[in-house]
């Protein structure tokens, strides 16, 4: 058995709706099933989703505040006022800034941009920045991807005579800033049809309004910010992402070309993963390490030399960010382990930790421990701790932190993520309170991650063609993630570790008609918990592996499970003790039927764990449900093994079977051996077995055990009698078959057991042991005979 690490949530779609979509849209049942599950269960909604490019953008002037904003900006341009774009330091922020900068430059505006320093100024507009902007002669500020919470700063701007236009997409608070115009789809009174635009999406709509036509040349920037900011990829966001990725593949932006080249990507093959894993992390890294201005300069650059230099600088900053995150994560993990793994919520803090990457570290702690996690960087000079939090399903982080408002002067966020600032001296109190809240909120089940399953399919369903069809639903992202498929009860054909450090795993699974490769990155430990021949279920993402111009389907493993017990065949393996040592001690049950077998274990701790089974009652009473049974040596009888296993439900059985040369006869006497020995006894008349048995054995090339065994068989059958240790033939004894002897029967069964245990294949052994575990008395007798 191999337990899944996650809770698999399987929601099977309405098959009538699947059939209807399949027939009306001429798509495969696999694609139709996913559309139904994603909520596109009518032909009209599904067709629109699949053919997003045929849709139209909404009129930007449907958004509240758009006309006022456009009019004021056009007035500033016509009067040659200086306009400042006030942006944010993440990928959404820098693309928003670039979209607005490009638009205003195209309109010949006097324009510049300002992005606050994350470390000195923090997020959003600030009073000092506004005063500085005013002193530099600017009369209009346009915020992008920020500003909706800048109530105080708006008052300062008004006092200074600065006009402010806010474009944002973050949740509006109860009080909105008093400014010239607010362009925000979620503001009260806004009837814009789509509310989930990213910051760059709102900026793109303003650009559309200002230019009087759809700014196609800005779609690549809009797509990058939209995908990077993890907003839902449906409706207008899906249109932006789809058309924007097409534009990105043929972009003329020198900076983007250089950055993708440095990341090892191909601009002509760019997709949502290119943005998510290559562009976004690098654009985000700039503002995490230093001021974000170089990211904007990169996106705006029209000089190839400058673009190359900026891309190299940004790529280097990303490498620094990766090293920083790795170091901080290692330190944070060590802290968590020192604090104790019994905590229901994690709060770690350290002086010198970069506040720009604490959110990434918090996410990694959640991945590692699956607990709500807060990671704080401490500024010792100011005595404050600043950080980020990430949560798990079932724990509302924002509500929980709201209960700690008295020690959190600054915090904000939503149920799954938050940011905060507090006094460094209050960190222990925050840890204590958050753990108490989590203790009272979370159940044991909540600490098991949830894996949603989109589709249940067979091995034969995953083909190059079906994966290509599934890509009709791309680009994938929030609310339209790459589908996770479940392949149930396939046969595991092969499993092995791969990679330079053997940290990854590759499997081959099959059913009656097809086979499929499965790859799990950083899942090398799976190899130790499964054996070929097992029935395995795997949840993963479908992908195409292309090598030497040959395409093959594969499944990227997210989780795996084996519901049946497994047999690990370690007979004759030299490294068996290493394998046994690596098993979790809480599950390990080492069984021996001979006391001296324990001496063959090199590890003292393992020797102390051995359970020596010496009676059938002891074997029957041994609780092995859920255990990893390690059988060190063969049982003395089939009955003993049956009593050990019948009715039990172990998860695994490890066969070691260290052989002892005295355990079984080296040879089983043939009938001719018995004939010769009987004739010998008739001729001798009397024979002292103890005194002369070894001489006879040596003369015949037999073992002493062979002589003793044949003697006991003759005694069982009444052929001989023993007086004072001397053996003599009984005259007139009734003729009987050797198999009538209980001694002969027992040894015959033991020899058959020896053959079965030592020479059967692992598959044959497992089938046979299954009978022992499930048998009733009638089945037991049947097992004895087979």
UniProtKB/Swiss-Prot annotation:
It is an enzyme of class 3 (hydrolase). GO terms for biological process: DNA recombination; DNA repair. It is found in: Cytoplasm, Nucleoid. Gene3D superfamilies: 3.10.310.30, 3.90.1640.30. One of its GO terms (molecular function) is DNA binding. The lineage of its organism: Bacteria, Bacillati, Bacillota, Bacilli, Bacillales. Pfam families: DHH, DHHA1, RecJ_OB, ssDNA-exonuc_C. Disruption phenotype: Cells lacking this gene show only slightly increased sensitivity to DNA-damaging agents. However, cells lacking RecJ and with a mutated AadAB enzyme were extremely sensitive to these agents, as sensitive as recA deletion strains. The doubly mutated strain shows 10-fold impaired growth in the absence of these agents. A recJ deletion suppresses the lethality of pcrA DNA helicase depletion and increases survival of the strain in the presence of H(2)O(2) but not methyl methanesulfonate, although the surviving cells are very small. Putative single-stranded-DNA-specific exonuclease. RecA thread formation during DNA double-strand break repair requires RecJ or AadAB. It comes from Bacillus subtilis (strain 168). Interacts with SSB (sbbA). Its EC number is 3.1.-.-. Residues 300-332 form a coiled coil. Belongs to the RecJ family. One of its GO terms (cellular component) is nucleoid. SUPFAM superfamilies: DHH phosphoesterases. This is Single-stranded-DNA-specific exonuclease RecJ. Residues 485-563 bind DNA. Keywords: Coiled coil, Cytoplasm, DNA-binding, Exonuclease, Hydrolase, Nuclease. InterPro entries: DDH_dom, DHH_sf, DHHA1_dom, RecJ, RecJ_C, RecJ_OB, SSDNA_exonuclease_RecJ.
